[in-house]
């Protein structure tokens, strides 16, 4: 049985698109996991910083002026880190949304390519069946 060149080419194009989108989906999923992991690590780091830099009167009361100054400087550093954390968190949220969108788009394209491949196979099988019936 010979497959018509048009069907064969269409199948190969759909197969290549499927493979390409499968790779794109895998990359998007990997990037998504990476961003989410970094977000969790940053949240944990911020919890630690917040715990070390509390400026409650109880904490400050037992310290001499040098210790209080150091504690205030640490709190200022923590405040800067906290601002950076929230900016990074917003950037990470945008990246998460981007990678989720890219993964969904790749999955949609994979599904379309799969339908084209299935259609090509069905068409070839149908033609083979029709050809076999007319020969018999």
Task: Please place each PLM-identified region on the residue numbering.
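Short, charge-rich amphipathic alpha-helices with coiled-coil/heptad character
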Residues: 1-30
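Extended alpha-helical coiled-coil "stalk/arm" regions
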Residues: 32-74
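Short, glycine/alanine-rich amphipathic alpha-helical segment
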Residues: 60-95
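Short acidic DE-rich linear segments
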Residues: 129-136
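C-terminal alpha-helix/helix-terminus motif
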Residues: 121-124, 128
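Long amphipathic alpha-helical coiled-coil segments
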Residues: 32, 36-39, 43, 84-120
């Amino acid at each position: 049985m010979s497959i018509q060149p048009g069907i064969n080419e269409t199948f190969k194009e759909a197969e290549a698109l499927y493979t390409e989108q499968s790779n794109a989906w895998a990359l998007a999923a990997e990037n998504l996991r990476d961003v989410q992991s970094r977000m969790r690590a940053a949240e944990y780091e911020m919890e630690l910083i917040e715990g070390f830099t509390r400026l409650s009167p109880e904490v400050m009361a037992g310290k001499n002026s040098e210790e209080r100054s150091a504690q205030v400087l640490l709190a200022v550093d923590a405040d800067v880190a906290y601002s950076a954390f929230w900016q990074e968190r917003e950037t990470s949220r945008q990246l998460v949304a981007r990678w989720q969108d890219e993964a969904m788009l790749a999955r949609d394209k994979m599904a379309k390519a799969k339908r084209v491949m299935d259609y090509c196979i069905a068409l070839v099988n149908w033609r083979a069946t029709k050809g076999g019936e007319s020969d018999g």
